[in-house]
UniProtKB/Swiss-Prot annotation:
Keyword match Heme: yes
Task of the protein: This monoheme basic protein appears to function as an electron donor to cytochrome oxidase in T.thermophilus.
Gene3D superfamilies named in the record: Cytochrome c-like domain (1.10.760.10)
Post-translational modification: Binds 1 heme c group covalently per subunit.
Gene for this chain: cycA
Protein name, UniProt field: Cytochrome c-552
Origin species: Thermus thermophilus
UniProt: heme c binding residues: C11, C14, H15, M69
Keywords for the protein's UniProt record, in alphabetical order: Electron transport, Heme, Iron, Metal-binding, Transport
GO function term, MF aspect, one: metal ion binding
Keyword Metal-binding tagged: yes
Lineage: Bacteria, Thermotogati, Deinococcota, Deinococci, Thermales
Length: 131
């Protein structure tokens, strides 16, 4: 079984070990992941971000970010599921979402076929009502 905390070490350089990000440069995950998971389509969006990256302006907790998140498509499906489970649980976000179910490799595999660009992932974010 993949170790999500260990895989997250690749994310911590930008999003920080505590999930707080770097204001103005890299958005926080802690607290924001719950907001995403609470939206219909939020689970799929989080998977898409890891598979295809994200590019363009977003807003998290009132702060704007305009950068590029790289794709992590090189990770195996079970590794992507494991790191998503880590970010959903490490800072208590999953507890804020009614009926949270752990991410699975099967969910990741289904979305891997989409072949989106980072800009298309941004469009998916906007469909969720997130800035």
């Amino acid at each position: 079984q993949a170790d999500g905390a260990k895989i997250y070490a690749q994310c911590a350089g930008c999003h920080q070990q505590n999930g707080q990000g770097i204001p103005g440069a890299f958005p926080p995950l802690a607290g924001h992941v719950a907001e995403i998971l609470a939206k219909e389509g939020g689970r799929e969006y989080l998977i898409l971000v890891l598979l295809y990256g994200l590019q363009g302006q977003i807003e998290v907790k009132g702060m704007k970010y305009n950068g590029v998140m790289s794709s992590f498509a090189q990770l195996k499906d079970e590794e992507i599921a494991a790191v998503l489970n880590h970010i959903a649980t490490a800072w208590g976000d999953a507890k804020k979402v009614k009926g949270f179910k752990p991410f699975t490799a099967e969910e990741v595999k289904k979305l891997r076929a989409k072949k989106l660009t980072p800009q298309q992932v941004l469009a998916e974010r906007k469909k969720l009502g997130l800035k």
